[in-house]
Amino acid sequence: MRLLKADITKVDNVDAIVNAANTSLLGGGGVDGAIHRVAGPLLLKECRQLNGCEVGQAKITSGYNLPVEYVIHTVGPIWKSGNADESQLLAACYRNSLHLAQKCNIRKIAFPAISTGIYGYPVVEATKIAFQVVKEYVQDNPGDFDLVEFVLFDDSTYNVYLKEIGSNLIEL
């Protein structure tokens, strides 16, 4: 696992980036809006054909004008004080994104901090879930991934990830 403080739309060292999408898959705010803006109108056209995505699930499209071949769209949970299966749904986002990547022979993947922006998921809790799921998935599927990267846009989120990664380092 690797951390990178950057704009995920500019990451060019992976085969796919993960989009923290909404259920319509038609663009929105935060990382979702940025990915749609950079990828261009063909991404929106392909997303329309997917008929949305449920929370915790993942779907794949081409990357279009992005510097990656694919975008894996996943819909994270909206934080509701932890009483609405948010942790299981967030874990499913990471697990299902990795499973879809594996099915499509994607060996290098970059994740944003799913649900921690406008969806309000506490960053520390979200980080622990992300690391745990990725670590377990990669260990259960040895040799299937060359790089799993977390691309974080702001200093505060990056610093939380940096603090939490210590006990979760794994070699791919």
What are these regions (language model features)?
Residues 1-103:
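Glycine-/small-residue-enriched capping loops at alpha/beta junctions
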